[in-house]
Amino acid sequence: MFKVAIIGSGPAGLSAAARAAALGLSHVLLEKTDHLSDTIYKYQKGKHVMATPSNLVLRSDIDFEAGKREVILGTWDDQIAGHKVNVKYMAEAKSIRGTGDAIPGSVQQIVSRARDGTKSVREIQRHTPPYAIELTNGETIMAENVILAIGTQGNPNRMRCPGADLPHVQYQLDDPAEYVDEHIVIVGTGDAGIENARGLAEDPAQRNTVSILNRSTEFPTAKDANVKALNADHEAGKLMIRTESETKSIEPGFITLTTRDGELRIPCDRIIARIGSAPPRAFVEECGIEFSSEDRSAFPKLSPVFESTAPGIFVIGALAGYPLIKHCMNQGHDVIEFINGNT
């Protein structure tokens, strides 16, 4: 039986685990892959990671400052090993259930929607801790408290148009240098989409023809520096920004766009869609955690100390609605302090 089980080894989970180790709490950090911090691990190679907001003081037993992806991952690997954090790799949580007494009047309603628009409602009775965390390999981990730090990147928003399920549509770019002499279309003009487009167009020797689609003429979700750099690349002829353009359909070798001037069919060998992500709602609700609304992008209901509607299960990081790394790390530190009785 652990005092706390932390699920997910992103910035929030790592910070929580490091604090638990520093305080001498019995703990386990469950990571479904064979490496730490999968979200940052999947960042584009060489990506510069920002440390915003700059005026926020970091509360964590592991370090973080702006720098290259590879440097940050190396620092965290070294420090987690130095803190002797109890990490269990290849440990994906399948379910979390309370094994204590039933909580009177505490029921989680789960609404399921069919494709025809009909919906059904079922109820889950909440139970007190300790919690049994069943892993996909059949193993069960017992813990008095659970911290969910699983983020949202494993649940990307999918394209919805004819041909969206074709194999050349992808939602991740690891290394731009892998792609040569291709017509590539980036869908999404947030920071990830812009960085992917610029990375693919950076080296003329790769001979890629890169377009990035923008439904409007503005870039409201991207950092100013990224927008300026993208516009500069467009002006230099390295890539093309297609404004007021949306995907109508996809077929092998081509993509058809709906534009201000009508339909446009252009060559396309690969589509990289970076259109955001949403909380893994089904899994979270099965844990007895209620969401703030029925909207797909809604986040779980949480107390001021990030405790969910399931007593003893805490939600931190991007899954709690805080995508910035420093915020995530502070939350991991603070939740462990709360669990340890330091309110």
Give the residues covered by each predicted segment.
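Rossmann-like dinucleotide/flavin-binding elements
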Residues: 1-29, 172-219, 283, 304-343
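Extreme N-terminal leader/targeting segments of oxidoreductases
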Residues: 1-4, 120-124, 154-155, 161-172, ...
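Short hydrophobic core segments
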Residues: 7, 140-153, 185-187, 266-276
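Beta1-alpha1 glycine-rich phosphate/pyrophosphate-binding loop at the start
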Residues: 9-85, 194-225, 291-296, 334
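Glycine-rich nucleotide phosphate-binding loop and flanking beta-alpha elements
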Residues: 13, 95, 154-155, 193, ...
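A Rossmann-like FAD-binding core segment of flavoenzymes
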Residues: 53, 71-135, 140-142, 204-293
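Flavin (primarily FAD) binding-site architecture
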Residues: 148-164, 277-289
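FAD-binding beta-loop-beta segment adjacent to the flavin cofactor pocket
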Residues: 288-314
